[in-house]
Structure formats: structure tokens, C-alpha cells
Amino acid sequence: MELKQEMASLLKTSPNAVKKRLLHQIGLSLYNTSHGFHEEEVKKKLEQFPGGSIDLQKENSGIGILTLNNPSKMNAFSGVMMLQLLEKVIELENWTEGKGLIIRGAKNTFSSGSDLNAVKALGTPEDGMAVCMFMQNTLTRFMRLPLISVALVQGRALGGGAEVTTACDFRLMTTESEIRFVHKEMGIIPSWGGATRLVEIIGGRQALKVLSGALKLDSEKALNIGMVDDILPSSDETECLKEAQEWLQQFIKGPPEVIRALKKSVSSCKELCLEEALQRERDILGTVWGGPANLEAVARKGKFNK
């Protein structure tokens, strides 16, 4: 009886309503006032720490280039950059033509994490937890973007910078780059969700080694433990970006609505229990089944096998 009612409800649900519901789910945050998190108060505190910028360029290819731009401080996140990252994530949530995203640092290095000026000023446990919740909210929304994302690690990704790479679907390094979770050396643990995501990427045992040893992961070591997906041949900033775009193209060929639906489906499987993940997969299927790309593919009569 319950199954019949659910099916009846599903049949009455319009595709537009399903799309609206899925878009709302993408933008959901982990924390709100019920968790003691007051976003506007945190924003006011972060505004006090200027410097750098988060720059977004949208390519006609459907690839977005997100650049952490604070080179005088190894692209460390100022308070303003944390706020701008959230703004860019919200913009990307609404970029319906987008299929892929590359996040990188300016001037051939990725990021050294948090700007120490902000860290020193926000020194109480309450401040630390507030910024933690803000960045976990932002990076979870980043992770849920319906775009296939790649962290292009040129130079060093340290501390919070290393955590940001874990919010991406894939990670690419050059022969000269390094990833290091230095949190232990700072007397803390990862606070932007990096430990949780790292366990998912490389498993609990390897994650414990990486975190407790504050290990320096060069490209070969990172590749061996499954932290990164490939090593790019060039270390030149411009050439390396081109190589990353070419690498990403193999996964985003096809109509945006199909690529985005695939990413949404995988994101659901990672976060939900089996029953909920299957239901979400059903909902996402309803946004592409019978659509232009599906009908065109069916009309080709299996030519994709050749």
C-alpha cells in the first residue's frame, strides 16, 4: 500500500518540481541556528580580515576555473576570501551550462591554508568552531556542486589548502608539488571537513598515517596511496592548466544536463543511506529520461558501441 502511494505521488510530481527539489538539496548547509551557528555573525567577523580574492572564470567549454588569489601569502585564505568562496559556490550552483570545475592557486602554488592574522585574532574555541562550521558548510556545498571538480595542485597545498583539495572529485599534481596536512604541527586537527573526506579518499589507516605523521606527500607518494589521480608532465603555470583542462574533458563530454545528473547521483550515493540514495537516483533519472540527449542517443541505435 505504501509503495502504491509513493508511486502515485511520484507520477503526480512534475519534472520541474523534481528539479526544484534537487537544486534545493544541493544548496543545503550542514549547520544552522539549531546548531548554534549564526552565519551573519560569522560573516561580520570574517569581513575584518581583508586580502586576496577568489576569482571565477567560466569557459565556453563548460569548465569553470576557480583561482585562489593571494600570492603574497601563498594563497592563504583571508576572512574575505572565505566569504568570497561561499559567494562563488552559490554562483556555481546556479550555472546550468557548467559541467566541470578546476580549482587552483595563483602564481604556481595552491594554498597554505588559513591566513595567520585571522587565526591569531580568532583565538577562542568559540571562534574556531564558528569558522569551522562556516567552512564546512561552504566546502560541503562545493562538494555537492553538480560539476565534476578537479583540484590542480601546483606548488604546495598545506593545512586548510590540503583540506580544500579533498572537497574535489579528483586531484592532479605536478612533479614538483606537495600536499601536507600540517594541522598536528599547529596543535589542532583538520577543521574544514578534511579528515572526514580524507578517510573516504584513502581509507582510515592511510589517513591516520598522513594526519598523525604530518606527512609530506610528493606527487609519487600521493599517487601510490590514492590521494591523487594523475601527475601532469608540466610544471609551468599556464601549460599545467591546459593539461588539467584536457584531462577533465574526458569526463565531461556530453550534454550538461547528463553530466550534472551523473554527478548528483554519485554525490547522493556518498551521503545517503541505501534507500534514500536509490530514491534520489530515481528522482535524478526523471530529469533526463526522455530528454533531448536521451532521445538522440536512442535514435543512434547503439552507435556508441563502435
Curated annotation (Swiss-Prot):
The modification N6-acetyllysine is found at residue 216. GO terms for cellular component: cytosol. The keyword Cytoplasm applies. The modification N6-succinyllysine is found at residue 216. Its EC number is 4.1.1.94. GO terms for biological process: fatty acid beta-oxidation. Keywords: Acetylation, Cytoplasm, Lyase. SUPFAM superfamilies: ClpP/crotonase (SSF52096). Gene3D superfamilies: 2-enoyl-CoA Hydratase, Chain A, domain 1. It is an enzyme of class 4 (lyase). It catalyses: (2S)-ethylmalonyl-CoA + H(+) = butanoyl-CoA + CO2; (S)-methylmalonyl-CoA + H(+) = propanoyl-CoA + CO2; (2R)-ethylmalonyl-CoA + H(+) = butanoyl-CoA + CO2. One of its GO terms (molecular function) is carboxy-lyase activity. It is found in: Cytoplasm, Cytosol. Belongs to the enoyl-CoA hydratase/isomerase family. Decarboxylates ethylmalonyl-CoA, a potentially toxic metabolite, to form butyryl-CoA, suggesting it might be involved in metabolite proofreading. Acts preferentially on (S)-ethylmalonyl-CoA but also has some activity on the (R)-isomer. Also has methylmalonyl-CoA decarboxylase activity at lower level. This is Ethylmalonyl-CoA decarboxylase. It comes from Bos taurus. The lineage of its organism: Eukaryota, Metazoa, Chordata, Craniata, Vertebrata. The gene is ECHDC1.
